[in-house]
Amino acid sequence: MEICSLINRLIKYALKNSLITEDDVMFVRNELMALLHLKDWQDVKENCQIPEYPQEILDKICDYAVEQKIIEDGVTDRDIFDTEIMGKFTAFPREIIETFKELSQQNIKLATDFFYNFSKKTNYIRTERIEKNLYWKSLTEYGDLEITINLSKPEKDPKEIERQKNMPQVNYPKCLLCYENVGFAGTLTHPARQNHRVIPLTLDNERWYFQYSPYVYYNEHAIIFCSEHREMKINRDTFSRTLDFINQFPHYFIGSNADLPIVGGSILSHDHYQGGNHEFPMAKSEIEKEVIFDKYPNIKAGIVKWPMSVLRLKSLNRKDLVDLADKTLKAWREYSDEEVGVFAYTNSTPHNTITPIARKRGDYFEIDLVLRNNRTDEANPLGIFHPHSEHHNIKKENIGLIEVMGLAVLPGRLKFEMRKIAEYLKDEDFEKKISDDKDTAKHLTWLKAFINKYSNLKTLSVDEILENILNVEIGLTFSRVLEDAGVFKRDEKGKNAFLKFINHIGGRF
């Protein structure tokens, strides 16, 4: 039976990657047989190739389950089922926590390397999907920005969407980040997590948990979430916790989305941070104007050369950093400057907050404070300091932590739309073709603004147009999107307004 062969291959994969030992083989085989309603077993002797990740085997097992009417043939049904399968190979939480602790006593990087690799091998991180994402770097005046087009989310068919609508509403787990997700079986509206494990942490004397993001937008993309389901809040404790984290994980950065709609992330209902082993473009950006805080002689400070408004603080002294960061946050919460359209409140609704990012530089602690404002008006209903409408063809979604640091996460539609445009650009009447096509018409104004810079279109292949023109311009557009989100603009008026705020919090130049 072919299904026995597939189970055998999956068991060999698990053995090769130390997910199980020989002593576990019979137990796991019987578990999988029960899951697949198999009443008999046929021994298979074959020299099969073991893949790096298990998805190819899992897809075939899911095909069998569909044929046998064990599951429906929907993307979510398959995800739920293959997660249940991999859950059979995933060690109990206590074992993973114990291994992580033992390794961290030798070296914290050994521990994170183990946990990240484990999260990929159990297919909690669906590596084969993530590898579909497009990625490139774009040179701008702010250095190389990083661009990714997100193609890893599979499309659901209409029947599945309809079934989801008819599902009864439940509140367990309360959200995608809650601790209750560990081992959860999943539903059509909430992902299965039998292969999900988390590591307990103490941050500033409070219980938090460390996990990896299943979507991995950058290397070792981690999520650090509170044990309690409570709303996102940026305050003094945020700075204490983030500095505590990088003290424990000096090879990682950590940052928080802002705590207000529009300028915040997609999950404001559960207090959490994101981190990882990646140096973002913003971290590479230099100080363009040094700032002195006389009350904090141990802190080196400055305004960062970045499209958004960023104050960088650096010190060996964590307490001083927390004090000044908190002072800056409290002042910014109440700060208005009519001349540049910054208002702290509309009636009693607050608009000002901060996106903080922390990292270690040798023995130094460094924290970037990105000033944010979520006000809207009639001309900008999605946000004044938000991607402007002329850039919505490329990016109209919120500018969250990852984008703030210089990595654009762009919608999957762009892959298809840009390829079409590249093909049309080979024709004389490309403007008409682009405007007549509902998929590409929205890009015409954007295209006309730069296309005359490029005189050799006819000699380039479609791939060359994509790589050397369209990808370059997408990167430049992303830098302008970040400028849109900056509260103090990069012109003289904006720069002076930023200096005025720095003076307001006790800084001088």
Curated annotation (Swiss-Prot):
Q: Which organism is it from?
A: Fusobacterium nucleatum subsp. nucleatum (strain ATCC 25586 / DSM 15643 / BCRC 10681 / CIP 101130 / JCM 8532 / KCTC 2640 / LMG 13131 / VPI 4355)
Annotated pathway: Carbohydrate metabolism; galactose metabolism
Q: Which GO terms describe its cellular component?
A: cytoplasm
Q: Which family does it belong to?
A: Belongs to the galactose-1-phosphate uridylyltransferase type 2 family.
Q: Which GO terms describe its biological process?
A: galactose metabolic process
Which keywords does this chain's UniProt record carry?
Carbohydrate metabolism, Cytoplasm, Galactose metabolism, Nucleotidyltransferase, Transferase
Q: What class of enzyme is it?
A: transferase
Per its record, the protein catalyses:
alpha-D-galactose 1-phosphate + UDP-alpha-D-glucose = alpha-D-glucose 1-phosphate + UDP-alpha-D-galactose
User: What Pfam families does the record point to?
Assistant: GalP_UDP_tr_C, GalP_UDP_transf
Designated gene of the protein: galT
Q: What is the recorded name of this protein?
A: Galactose-1-phosphate uridylyltransferase
What taxonomic ancestry is recorded? Bacteria, Fusobacteriati, Fusobacteriota, Fusobacteriia, Fusobacteriales
Classification via InterPro entries: GalP_uridyl_Trfase_II, GalP_uridyl_Trfase_II_CS, GalP_Utransf_C, GalP_Utransf_N
Query: Is Nucleus among this UniProt entry's keywords?
Result: no
Molecular function (GO) terms for this protein are: UDP-glucose:hexose-1-phosphate uridylyltransferase activity
- Subcellular location as annotated: Cytoplasm
Catalytic activity, EC: 2.7.7.12
